[in-house]
Amino acid sequence: MTDRSSRLSRALKAYDLRGRVGDDLDDDLLFALGWGTVRTMRARHGTAGVVIGADMRPDSLGFARALARGVAAAGGAPTLLGLCSTDQLYFASGRSGLPGLMVTASHNPSGWNGIKVCGPHAAGISRAGGLDAIADSALDAPPDPAAGDPAAAAEPRPDPDAARELAVGYAETIRAQTGITGLRRPLTVIADCGNGMAGKLLPEVFGTAALAAPAPLDVRGMYTELDGTFPNHPANPLDPANLVDVQAAVVDSGADLGLAFDGDADRCFVIDETGRATSASAIGALVARREIARARAAGEDTPVVLHNLITSRAVPETIRAAGGRPVRTPVGHSGIKQLMAEHRAVFACEHSAHFYFRDFSGADSGMLAACHVIAALAETGGTLSALLADLDPYAGSGEINSTVADPAAALARFRDAARAGTFGAGTVDELDGVTLTGADFWANVRPSNTEPLVRFNCETPDAARTAALTADVLALVRADDRP
């Protein structure tokens, strides 16, 4: 196996490429992937143009340049946007109709990097849908002509006009789709950017005079300096330890809510006025209600909203109550994007705080979701906790991972027990792993795409019952099967 091939095999994941800088990713591999992207996109879509963005990690701009050189070497036309968030890259792809490459490792720690790939119009791409083809084509790429030449490796430069147009167009779209320029009452928001790309977005979206009327929106940023070494805390809001600072700031300042973005700012977690981290399902239900209302106001009878199968049952209940039609999906970025296009869905939400919008080219945007929450809160005279109370009535387990020797055997044990009624009466389906759905509860066990483990989630009406169901299922899944 060649060095390029071995690096690719380590970096290629289910939905993107990700690895350690130096060990897995270097300029040569990024050059080859740019070359492979053009060859693949030209063959599949007849396009040779590619938009390329980079996050704030120390190697990201250099990697973006290597991608651009590879695109050009394959006869393509790269547009290098420079520093941007992942959802800005999706916006640029959607607006231009070109495929996109985003250099980012999202919430991974310092020392990691990667590439998120989208097709024309920000379409999702899976392994089978194009990632494998790009990787295979990359193996045939010539060497990077800039190798060993620092001056050549500093080229090409970002296009300042394209970057400026992106920032303005993105901000205008966020404002127009959420109505944050016309808030009914003043609000104070604490936004923890985690030294990630949200630090660039805050002044672009909120830092204009237009947001001062008719009611002021006071957005106070934390850790806004772009620094891919993450000196304050990892930009991973999935870990509760990384929410402590913004939670304290919200309570100490008496703010109305807090926001916590991940490194590439495509996800945003929301903190209520008490400092409590809100459920991504509750936020998804709130945004779904607003997107359904927008679509119905535009004449759509029964707007479709997608939700993955491990979001709270409050999500489909809210969708139906708002006049929409819920569609349940497997977990996974590229699959949801494809299903959004098939169903012409107005919105989609995942338990992981990925929120997708039809009017944002079907792509996910943490900032767009955050602004929906701000606008929804401003329409009330109350608190965020009160606004979300009826959208978060159930007790969920959260996702619990179990490392097992044989994931397929673990799933089979759960499937057999569920069908036998061991955990209560219900129906069993295999949309993604195995799900048992009862009259007032559900439980799901599904395999990881990349590791020898299974993931468990469940939800019931109360915490005690959820704890009991969790213990029973995990005991079965883990029984006699530890590696």
Regions found by a protein language model. Give the residues of each.
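N-terminal small/polar loop signature for handling phosphorylated ligands or for N-terminal nucleophile
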Residues: R39, G49-W112, E204-I271
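Short glycine-rich phosphate-binding loop at a beta-alpha junction
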Residues: G46-D55, T188-I190, P303-L309, V346
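An N-terminal, well-structured beta->alpha segment
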Residues: M1-L67, A73-A74, A163-P186
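A short, gly/pro- and small-residue-rich
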Residues: G111-D140, I271-V287, F360-C371, L377
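Gly/Ser/Thr-enriched, mixed-charge loops and adjacent short helices
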Residues: N113-S253
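Phosphate-binding and adjacent anionic-ligand microenvironments
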Residues: L257, A297-P483
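Proline/glycine-rich low-complexity loops and linkers
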Residues: G129-E172, A176, E273-H351, F355-F357
